[in-house]
Curated annotation (Swiss-Prot):
Organism per entry: Shewanella loihica (strain ATCC BAA-1088 / PV-4)
Source domain of life: Bacteria
HTH tetR-type domain segment(s): 7-67
InterPro entries per record: Homeodomain-like_sf, HTH-type_Tx_Regulator, HTH_TetR, NO_SlmA, SlmA-like_C
Protein name: Nucleoid occlusion factor SlmA
UniProt subcellular location: Cytoplasm, Nucleoid
UniProt-listed HAMAP family: NO_factor_SlmA (MF_01839)
UniProt GO cellular component terms: bacterial nucleoid; cytoplasm
Function: Required for nucleoid occlusion (NO) phenomenon, which prevents Z-ring formation and cell division over the nucleoid. Acts as a DNA-associated cell division inhibitor that binds simultaneously chromosomal DNA and FtsZ, and disrupts the assembly of FtsZ polymers. SlmA-DNA-binding sequences (SBS) are dispersed on non-Ter regions of the chromosome, preventing FtsZ polymerization at these regions.
NCBIfam families per UniProt: PRK09480.1
DNA-binding residue intervals: 30-49
Taxonomic classification: Bacteria, Pseudomonadati, Pseudomonadota, Gammaproteobacteria, Alteromonadales
Amino acid sequence: MAASPKINRREHILQCLATMLETSPGQRITTAKLAAEVGVSEAALYRHFPSKARMFEGLIDFIEESLLSRINLIMDEEKDTMRRCQLLLQLLLVFAERNPGISRVLNGDALLGENERLRNRTGQIFSKVETHLKQILREKTLREGKGFNLDEAILANLLLAVAEGRIAQFVRSDFKNKPTEHFAEQWQFIQQQLLQS
């Protein structure tokens, strides 16, 4: 008889937390509810995570690692400025769409009433993404000798705001309004405007 694979309890707890965030929008997740979902006692939860804040930090670590590692791939593999920007924004939107519960953490919705440090961490993720966008836009000037009529920092902020807005709509609609819906058409318009500037 084959032995069943050992469950990584820590990962299982985080998966259950993400699922609960997806299936219970607008509701506060308590450790008692999470323990029941995982099928363990609250004490067992605390053996793996010293606090609920640490559980959310585990999800934030997953978000940061997933996004930044893929952004680095985009930066290494793609050299065209507009394509890089498109892929980076698309990455954010697809990630949120594929991980609805986690998108509530990214958006900050699930962190209301939690430790301020958690909201700061998600803010730092968006700051890192914005820094990458600024770098991409500034490199256009270096590579092509022609920049934009508007400061790259302002443009990077605008592009990030588009993605953040789509994620916020997704969360607000209880995951009905997909962040990637109409993105191709929207990107075409945005790209035209950027290239005209």
